Amino acid sequence: MLNMKNIDRKVVATVAVFLLLAVVYFIPKPVLRMALPEIVVKYRIVGPLLTLSLAGIFLAPRLMTLAMIFSLCGDYMGAAGNFIGQMSFFAAAHAMLIAFFVQRFRTLPADLQACRYQESVPDGAPARKGVRAKALTVICSATAAAALLTFALTCIIPHVPAGVTRIGCVIYAVLICSMLALSMLQRHGLFALGAALFLFSDIILSWHRFVSPVPYSKYLIMITYYSGQLILWLTAVAKDEYKTRCQTC
């Protein structure tokens, strides 16, 4: 879990602004128009990710910050009604998250790599059981990603208009499922939770757009989206995460 002692005041301030702007997004437009210019009302969706992007320049790893920036651009394109642009920028965001997870795993200290797959292995058990635990984690991650990708390809993609949009959706589905699988390989529950919320948001959005209307879709999509992004960002900026994790292995 996230160690609150590793979160500084700048991060707390960032989260406060993020939550405030997220609440503003859900305020009805007629109410907002009484106090804000029309352009601010139209593009208010970008506020929370703009906050994470700007703060991330100083607080977060570079790849995570790039993921937030591309997500911000995706939000802007969505508000502007450009679905292809929206999908393209979010695909880039997932590519950055994939790179972040790969880099993070490859650069873990050797002692943490040694202990992270021994967590479920009893003391004194043969070392090969740790290898089996690692293999099981990889298999479970790949299976989950494959199942979700199969669901997207069979239940959603056939309803997408043929052509560039459908091709883009297939590529996007592969990227986001890969991102989820890699988040699970981190063996850090919050990374996996954030990625899962992000994916759930996209499933609801695509189902609502291409298959059939989803009740309360705005709230289901945006609450899970904002929550997932915030969890990913917060987990990435936590100080001394590797040291804390290794001490608890």
List where the protein language model places each region:
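Polytopic alpha-helical membrane-helix bundles and their juxtamembrane interface segments
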Residues: L2-C249
